[in-house]
Amino acid sequence: MNETVRIEGKQIALRPITLEDTPLIVRWRSDPRVYGTLFRQEPITEERHRQWLREMVLSGKCIVDKAQNRPVGTVFLKEIDREHLRAEYAIFIGEETARGRGIGSEAARLMTDYGFQQLGLNRIYLYVFASNVRAITSYRSAGFREEGRLRENYRCKDGNFADVLMMSILR
C-alpha cells in the first residue's frame, strides 16, 4: 500500500500513520478498553509501538474524524498475499467519543474498497473475539460475513479461553 495515499470518506479520512502519532497511539493501546479487544491484551510502550509502526507503516492508516480534524483510531490491511490476492484486516478506535458513530464501519468500507480496487485483492478477512458484539455488528454493516468460530482459540490474561470468529468479505 502506498504510504502517501489519503482516502476520503463522508465523516472520516484515512491518512498515513506517522511517528508523530506515537504518543496518541500508545495512549490508545494502553487503555484497557482498547487493548482488551485486541489479541495483544496488555499496555504498549513507545519502543514496542515504534517496532509495530515499522512493521505496519506501509499498510496502516490513521482514521481522522473530519468534523474535528483529529485522529481517532487506526486501520490496516496486513499479511498481504499477492499470490492468493488476500489480506487480513485490523482496526481499533482509540477515542471513546468516536465509538458508536459508524466510524469503524466507514473505515472498513474505505479500506476494503481500497484493497479491492487499488491492490487487486479478492478476499479480505479478519479475526474478532466472539464476545465483541459492537465490532461484529460494525463488520457486518461493512459487508463482512462470518465464516467460522474458532472455539477457545485465545487464552486471555485471566486464564479463561475465548472463542474467536473469522469473518471475510469478497470482491
Walk through the language-model features, giving the residues of each:
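Acetyl-CoA-dependent GNAT
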Residues: 42-98, 170-171
